[in-house]
Structure formats: structure tokens, C-alpha cells
């Protein structure tokens, strides 16, 4: 799951 709410990169 993409977590670009706070602005950090996470695994898809």
C-alpha cells in the first residue's frame, strides 16, 4: 500500500 500522505515512501 502506498502511503504518501505524510510524505514518506513505503513499499507498494
From Swiss-Prot:
An annotated GO cellular component: extracellular region
Source organism of this protein record: Mantophasma kudubergense
Functional note: FMRFamides and FMRFamide-like peptides are neuropeptides.
Organism placement in taxonomy: Eukaryota, Metazoa, Ecdysozoa, Arthropoda, Hexapoda
Main location: secreted
Keywords tagged on the record: Neuropeptide, Secreted
Keyword flag Secreted: yes
Family label: Belongs to the FARP (FMRF amide related peptide) family.
One GO term (biological process): neuropeptide signaling pathway
Protein name: Extended FMRFamide-10
Compartments reported by the entry: Secreted
Coiled-coil boundaries: none
Amino acid at each position: 500500500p502506498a502511503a504518501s500522505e505524510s510524505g514518506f515512501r513505503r513499499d507498494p
